[in-house]
UniProtKB/Swiss-Prot annotation:
Classification via HAMAP family: 23SrRNA_methyltr_RlmD
Residue positions of the active site: C409 (nucleophile)
Lineage: Bacteria, Pseudomonadati, Pseudomonadota, Gammaproteobacteria, Pseudomonadales
A Pfam family per the record: TRAM
Protein's UniProt name: 23S rRNA (uracil(1939)-C(5))-methyltransferase RlmD
CDD domains: AdoMet_MTases
Function: Catalyzes the formation of 5-methyl-uridine at position 1939 (m5U1939) in 23S rRNA.
Chain spans, region Disordered: 1-25
Keyword Nucleus in annotation: no
Enzyme Commission number(s): 2.1.1.190
Domain TRAM: 22-80
PANTHER family: 23S RRNA (URACIL(1939)-C(5))-METHYLTRANSFERASE RLMD, RNA M5U METHYLTRANSFERASE
Length: 452
């Protein structure tokens, strides 16, 4: 059946009425950037839409290319700088405009810290309706040369019949060939510089998955492989690692294992004369200097006395529990993963720490019903993952702790949990950022709560 043409000039609209047409991907648009979002992108407003522009700073006029548009939100990338902000700097890294590892190198370090502090303050105010009674100065270390672990992407290009080695591009699976990374600690920079050559020299590069680099009490290279490595390739990798004074670890279908069974990875906590052993796959803070400063601040805020019992929730390998045990009468440390509990307990034994007890518990559930939770504590330390500690803090007042330090890698969940703690009678005494990841917008924070 034929349809008559309409002469009204109106286009057909789907059910729901008139809709604003979407901004096409790839379109270039001139924008005036008004402020920075918490993730470091510039924010602009145009035609009723909010634009998020990566690489742009507040006060700049830019030409941006649309990457994605949905509803009233447009994501874009800086294409051309029309008017630069006075604080803009030339990114120190020559790969910065392509690599996805860093996103704030164009912003001076002091301004990065101010952005992170503002992000934390806004989350606390917006979500919890609170501000700390006092702000702590940001905990920060070197802005470059701080990262003690890295994951190197590896992919066999079937068409070109060559191995790609490097870091992922921003929001992409593309691999950027990089032989120098300014945020890595020096020993890993040296390994990274020569790694692509040795990987491409292997007889079966198609067998490679990805490679991880670690630095601590020793350096290590972990090679993940999706098919068995020929003996000659393993020997070549071993020779490379020996020349780099690094351990070689391999991982096929099972757990990572060192080629030398006696090899161990560890990191030192010098102020407490501790050395913690760990394995690839375990959570370890990437920034050694800020990690030490973070522990020192947590202990200063908690101020555990020699006659007090302290609870450490989400204890991991014992990063906080063992230093706490140097000051408190007893530390009870709890972690959700049994393998981590076992390693934390082993770390305590190996460091002659005898006043710390370790337990496994599902910390996504309330604490009620656990024997160790019924014992009572003077102070509590929480260091949860990004999801926060919502279930745990629901009934934390029953522990009768006077002081509580919350270490967070997500200001949004910290603010959510702070609202619960304030509702239970705790006061937010102090808060501040931990600059664990300079040159990125990632915010870590610490907050001190006191009862009554």
């Amino acid at each position: 059946m034929s349809k008559k043409k309409s002469n009204s000039g109106l286009r057909f609209q789907p059910a729901g009425g008139n809709r604003t047409p979407q901004v096409p991907v790839g379109k270039k648009q001139r924008l005036d950037i008004e402020r920075l979002a918490g993730d470091g992108r510039g924010i602009a407003f145009l035609d009723g839409r909010t634009w998020f522009v990566s690489g742009a700073l507040a006060g700049e006029a830019v030409e941006a290319r649309v990457l994605n548009a949905r509803g009233k939100v447009v994501e874009a990338r800086l294409e051309r700088l029309l008017q630069a902000a006075p604080e803009r700097r030339e990114a120190p890294c020559r790969y910065y405009d392509r690599c996805g590892g860093c996103n704030l190198q164009h912003l001076p370090h002091e301004a990065q810290l101010a952005l992170k502090q503002r992000t934390l303050a806004e989350q606390l105010q917006r979500v919890a309706g609170v501000q700390p009674e006092a702000w702590a100065a940001p905990l920060s270390g070197p802005e470059f040369g701080y990262r003690r672990r890295a994951r190197v992407a590896v992919r066999w290009d079937v068409k070109a019949r060559q191995l790609e080695v490097g870091f992922r591009a921003e929001a992409s699976q593309d691999i950027i060939a990089i032989d120098d990374c300014a945020v890595l600690v020096q020993p890993l920079q040296s390994i990274l510089r020569h790694l692509p050559t040795v990987l491409r020299s292997l007889s079966k590069p198609q067998a490679l998955g990805h490679v991880e680099l670690f630095s601590g009490t020793a350096e290590a290279v972990l090679v993940r492989h999706v098919a068995p490595l020929p003996a000659e390739d393993q020997a070549r990798l071993q020779a490379f690692c020996e020349q780099a004074n690094a351990q070689l670890w391999l991982q096929g279908e099972g757990e990572p294992a060192p080629v030398d069974p006696a090899a161990q990875l560890g990191f030192a906590l010098a102020p407490w004369q501790l050395e913690l052993a760990w394995r690839p796959g375990d959570f370890v803070q990437v920034n050694a200097q800020v990690n030490t400063a973070m522990i020192e601040q947590a202990l200063a805020w908690l101020a555990p006395q020699a006659d007090e019992r302290v609870l450490d929730l989400f204890c991991g390998l014992g990063n906080f529990a063992l230093p706490l045990a140097r000051q408190a009468r007893e530390v009870v440390a709890v972690e959700g993963v049994q393998a981590m509990v076992d390693r934390a307990a082993a770390n305590a034994r190996n460091n002659n720490v005898h006043n710390a007890r370790f337990f496994q518990a599902d910390l996504s559930q309330p604490l009620a019903g656990t024997g160790w939770a019924a014992e009572g504590f003077s102070a509590v330390l929480l260091d949860p993952p990004r999801d926060g500690a919502f279930e745990v803090v629901q009934g934390i007042a029953r522990l009768k702790a006077r002081r509580l330090v919350y270490v967070s890698c997500n200001p949004a969940t910290l603010a959510r949990d702070a609202q619960v703690l304030v509702g239970q009678g705790y006061r937010l005494k102090r808060a501040g950022i931990l600059d664990m990841f300079p040159q990125t917008a990632h915010v870590e924070a610490m907050a001190l709560f006191e009862a009554g």
